[in-house]
Amino acid sequence: CTELQLMQSIAEAQPDVILHTAAISDTGYTEQHPEEAYRANVELPLWLARAAAQCGARLVGFSSDQVYAGVQQPGSLPETMELSPANVYGRQKLEMEQRMLDACPDTVLLRATWMYDLPSYGLPIRGNLPLNLIKATVYGEKLRFSNCDYRGITYVRQAVENLVPAADLPGGVYNYGSGNAENMVCLIEAVDWQRNLAMDCGKLRGYGIRFDTTQEGIYHCLNDYGVADL
């Protein structure tokens, strides 16, 4: 697909809203294949922004909490802070945000957290925190936790439900997902460093878009699937 082909397809469809969620989001793969990832994570979203500006469509795109990777500041992180992401994926997403807004200032960019759901409807699903907790409970496995890792994780159904009002937000960047002030899962307990990806979503709440806290969201998900009493 070329940029011209993409612009022609969008011009023919005349959409009111374009929702862009695709990315090469595996941080390890992105480190190993930065050029391939750059095309998916920066160039193609930029083409969409130019096409949206040309046809007058509203563009909503997903960024990532990985833009905050490497920050030393404690507490919930606002959209306005200076950023210098510590990994390739975070740097690419930050560049994507800047270039999309330059091309189409009306674009809404959502810095999404790690998300989760439980297996259902025959759809593929990757490992996630609630699923790992359920497996550990059922099979008597041990999990490791650390006080050095902070991030919110979000029930994907709530993220989807909030996309409709998000499409009406003013153009700009928004932290999007469940907040979390508690320690999160860290696979290597002995590593002596702290990671903080916990985002301040107050800007989003100012427009009436709300998420459960990370803890509330997990209970919400488990209740939806009838496994809260495991």
Regions found by a protein language model. Give the residues of each.
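Helix C-cap/helix->beta junction micro-motif
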Residues: 13, 54-55, 103
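NAD(P)-cofactor binding segment of oxidoreductase domains
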Residues: 18, 32-60
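SDR active-site strand-loop-helix element
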Residues: 18-22, 59-65, 71, 110-112
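Conserved catalytic-core motifs of eukaryotic protein kinase domains, centered on the activation segment
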Residues: 28-35, 70-74, 121
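Catalytic helix-loop patch of NAD(P)-dependent Rossmann-fold dehydrogenases
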Residues: 39, 43-47, 67-110, 115-116, ...
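NAD(P)-dependent short-chain dehydrogenase/reductase
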Residues: 98-151, 158
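Mid/C-terminal beta-alpha module of Rossmann-like enzyme folds, strongest
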Residues: 159-200, 212, 220, 225-230
